[in-house]
Amino acid sequence: MKRYLVLTLRKPAFDPAMIEPHYAHLDRLRAQGRLELAGPFSDRSGGAYLLLAGSLDDAIAAAHADPLHESGSSEVIVHEWDAK
């Protein structure tokens, strides 16, 4: 499994009602052993999470299943991350 950094950046039309469904999505990923860590940015402009996936396509699919992406509330960006 490779590590992928997922950035969630709030859009102007951000819907605060998507926060709880987003947390539920992260909980599902954590239960599957695919989430290493996650958290919001201190300025509340968005957040990031570290996702484990077999490929970039798998990571993008998991990140795009996030309600923040599905609702259009946040831009979701995925990068393969060679963290040491």
Residue ranges, per PLM feature:
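Conserved, structured core segments of small domains
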Residues: 1-84
